Amino acid sequence: MEQTLVIQKKKRFGFSQGIGITLLIAIVAKYLAELPFLNIMGQLVIAILIGMVWRAAIGVPHDAIAGTNFASKKLLRFGIILLGMRLNLVDIAKAGPKVLVIAAVVITFTLFVVYGLTKVFKVEKKLGILTACGTAICGAAAVVAIAPQVKAKDDETAVGAAIIAILGTIFTLIYTLLYPVLGFSPYGYGVFSGATLHEIAHVIAAAAPGGSTAVDIAVIVKLTRVTMLVPVAILIGVWFGKSEGSKEKRSWRDLPIPWFIFGFLAMSAVHSLGIIPEVVAGYIVVLAYMLIAMAMAGLGLNVEFKTFRKLGSKAFVAGLIGSVCLSVLGYVLVYALGFM
């Protein structure tokens, strides 16, 4: 009996230790994300990279794994639900139908192109789907939201999120350098940035040279893409379930429904209706990013650099080519739809 109590106490301590490590990493990532250049990467990206470095340099105690796994799965879902508070559907509606059109075209095009490229490069199917969704919708948040739909492993999820983060940072720097020669008005440049970059942090950083006009519309366009996360997650779950059905004999009733995504949508509706004051909504968004950063840290703590090299090289190339295609499409759409 006494031995059982000791074991249980040890497990509880290990669980708390795992949660504590992810929280520490998330806090450090938040402050690092406020520094020059690192603010381009954002808190989520930095958290997953710190997690990978922590594992390589220090290691993770065996008893702490339960806590890091809890953060990477349970806290992740809660964080995504709260992240819905970032959306204001009224602002998106005011932006007009053209914004919805450009978001729908960009997402559809990118999903097919990037996933097609991952097949050409023989990337593992689940990682290919995650790379495509992260590029098309909202970066690392999309990767971790779609992962349960395709039953992705932690290392696949972490590698997918890291790939998207690195690509987004590269393209953010390129956009900033090219802004003077692209020929866009600040408004058009904001639409272009919001329609083609990966993370919200990337969008804000890239649009900054265009001033507040560019940043404001860039965020609205980006958040319009984020709203597509709900239908895309459901469609991916249905499609993946059917594609695997012949092997697993799964029925439509067995398909995973991402209930936390509906929570995300519900929170965005609450924000849009003005039920919660903007100040409170802002704090909720900060909490959401903190929880998702803890999840990213948990994922990073479960991945070794050799795993990233093994799984990520071909997926990175596919994502790179796909991102170039996305940028070209975005450039064409800005001109075609009159966002000058």
From Swiss-Prot:
Topology of this chain in the membrane: Multi-pass membrane protein
Key word Transmembrane present: yes
Main location: membrane
Coiled-coil segments: none
Domain of life: Bacteria
KW Cell membrane (keyword) present: yes
UniProt keyword list: Cell membrane, Membrane, Transmembrane, Transmembrane helix
Location relative to the cell: Cell membrane
Pfam families, per the entry: Cons_hypoth698
Transmembrane segments: 13-35, 40-59, 99-118, 128-150, 157-179, 189-211, 218-240, 255-277, 279-301, 316-338
GO cellular component, as recorded: plasma membrane
Protein family (similarity comment): Belongs to the UPF0324 family.
Protein name: UPF0324 membrane protein BA_5405/GBAA_5405/BAS5024
Organism: Bacillus anthracis
